[in-house]
């Protein structure tokens, strides 16, 4: 009998999240425990999600029952940069549902988070996974686990046929597919197959629970929210990116050294990414805009600073599939180290299934707006157009 891809309970443990949520949470605990934030859900492809509201609410309510286990805490304790006070905090942490607000606004599903950053930070990934899986249960209930494996093996066979053994030995891929996965079981099957049969170098997964289950490295450093929040955490707006990077350096002392570049655009980021940061951080992550043009800018920036690009790593994570990743790998091989985080194309690529394009983004910090401009116009998210205009002015970003 074919095995279903759905489980009755969507999020079953606290570690079923992206690793960078925990790394940022620890930094928030140590540096901004009293910061207040607001988040807002958006479905970018305007799909009507109202019919699923009751089931989404039910699954959110079940998050309140989730708590970390002793074995999970022991796994985190083995990570050198996870501090004892943060581990103790996690042992006491529970999802507090008073910070989550769901309903219908302007004819669309609305989800908002409002509360202490420290206590709402872990909601983002489970909420997105819940919305995605609930919707998929209704629309694609006939999908079975075998289809997931068949589709993935087609990609692995293609890669084996296209790339030489020398290329495959250097071709690094990680699973970044938690938030928009078809279902939890789908992601688990993908990670299981990649660990066993990926022809290149499968370097890990962003999902902490699956990293623990499959003895993989949990992958991730910071997300946009880290840089966005600093727009309202005290420093002058023009200094906010450097303040975010500096706080990260002080927190992790050389660990977790991949910086995200597109909160306000790559050009604005590089203006702030001086010799100090370029030496301290191991590399950069691309998440919007033309990836090759972005990479060439990064390489040129390192060279201008007198840094050998081959001592640094570029991580690509924007809408990748195997052909795009291989194309980038070949274009940049010998110029700089590269690694690829593939998400939706691994965990929600099933024939006949349309993946969701959903986000849950921070919109305010300490009662004031924050924004992401990015290197792709469609990824800008902020209700306050005046603040976006001011942000563009401060960082010299054309409208």
Swiss-Prot record:
Pfam family, one: NAPRTase_N
Pathway as given in its UniProt record: Cofactor biosynthesis; NAD(+) biosynthesis; nicotinate D-ribonucleotide from nicotinate: step 1/1
Gene Ontology BP annotations: NAD biosynthetic process via the salvage pathway
Gene3D superfamilies per UniProt: nicotinate phosphoribosyltransferase
Keywords assigned: Ligase, Phosphoprotein, Pyridine nucleotide biosynthesis
GO terms for MF: nicotinate phosphoribosyltransferase activity
CDD domains registered for this protein in UniProt: PncB_like (cd01401)
E.C. numbers: 6.3.4.21
Record-linked InterPro entries: N/Namide_PRibTrfase, NAPRTase_N, Nic_PRibTrfase, Nic_PRibTrfase-Fam, Nicotinate_pribotase-like_C
Highest taxon listed in the record's lineage: Bacteria
Modified residues (Phosphohistidine): 224
Gene Ontology CC, one term: cytosol
Catalytic activity: nicotinate + 5-phospho-alpha-D-ribose 1-diphosphate + ATP + H2O = nicotinate beta-D-ribonucleotide + ADP + phosphate + diphosphate
Description of post-translational modifications: Transiently phosphorylated on a His residue during the reaction cycle. Phosphorylation strongly increases the affinity for substrates and increases the rate of nicotinate D-ribonucleotide production. Dephosphorylation regenerates the low-affinity form of the enzyme, leading to product release.
Functional note: Catalyzes the synthesis of beta-nicotinate D-ribonucleotide from nicotinate and 5-phospho-D-ribose 1-phosphate at the expense of ATP.
Family (UniProt): Belongs to the NAPRTase family.
PANTHER family in the record: NICOTINATE PHOSPHORIBOSYLTRANSFERASE
Identification of the protein by name: Nicotinate phosphoribosyltransferase 1
Species of provenance: Pseudomonas aeruginosa (strain ATCC 15692 / DSM 22644 / CIP 104116 / JCM 14847 / LMG 12228 / 1C / PRS 101 / PAO1)
Gene: pncB1
């Amino acid at each position: 009998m074919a095995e279903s891809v759905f489980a009755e309970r969507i999020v079953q443990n606290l570690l079923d999240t992206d690793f960078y949520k925990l790394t940022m949470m620890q930094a928030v605990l140590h540096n901004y425990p009293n910061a207040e934030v607001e988040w807002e859900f958006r479905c970018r492809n305007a799909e009507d999600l109202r019919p699923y509201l009751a089931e989404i609410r039910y699954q959110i309510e079940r998050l309140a029952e989730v708590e970390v286990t002793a074995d999970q805490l022991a796994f985190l304790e083995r990570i050198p940069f996870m501090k004892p006070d943060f581990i103790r905090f996690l042992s006491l942490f529970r999802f507090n549902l008073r910070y989550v607000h769901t309903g219908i606004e302007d004819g669309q599903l609305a989800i908002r988070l409002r509360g202490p950053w420290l206590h709402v930070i872990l909601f983002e990934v489970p909420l997105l996974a819940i919305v995605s899986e609930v919707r998929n249960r209704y629309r694609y209930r006939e999908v079975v686990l075998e289809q997931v494996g068949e589709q993935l093996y087609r990609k692995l066979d293609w890669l084996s046929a296209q790339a030489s053994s020398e290329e495959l030995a250097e071709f690094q891929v990680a699973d970044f597919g938690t938030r928009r996965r078809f279902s939890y079981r789908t992601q688990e099957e993908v990670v299981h197959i990649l660990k066993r049969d990926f022809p290149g170098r499968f370097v890990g997964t962003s999902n902490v629970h699956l990293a623990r289950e499959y003895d993989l490295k949990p992958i991730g450093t910071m997300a946009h929210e880290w840089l966005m929040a600093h727009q309202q955490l005290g420093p002058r707006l023009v200094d906010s990116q450097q303040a975010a990077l500096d706080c990260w350096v002080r927190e992790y002392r050389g660990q977790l050294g991949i910086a995200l570049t597109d909160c306000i655009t790559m050009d604005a980021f590089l203006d702030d990414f001086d010799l100090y940061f370029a030496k301290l951080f191991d590399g950069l992550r691309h998440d919007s805009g033309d990836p090759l043009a972005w990479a060439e800018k990064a390489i040129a920036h390192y060279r201008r600073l007198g840094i050998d690009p081959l001592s640094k790593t570029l991580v690509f994570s924007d809408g990748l599939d195997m052909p795009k990743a291989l194309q980038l790998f070949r274009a940049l091989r010998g110029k700089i180290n590269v690694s690829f985080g593939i998400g939706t194309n691994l965990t929600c690529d099933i024939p006949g299934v349309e993946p969701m394009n959903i986000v849950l983004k921070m919109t305010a910090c300490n009662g004031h707006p924050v924004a992401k401009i990015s290197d792709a116009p469609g990824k800008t998210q902020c209700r306050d157009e005046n603040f976006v205009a001011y942000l563009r002015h401060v960082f010299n970003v054309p409208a």
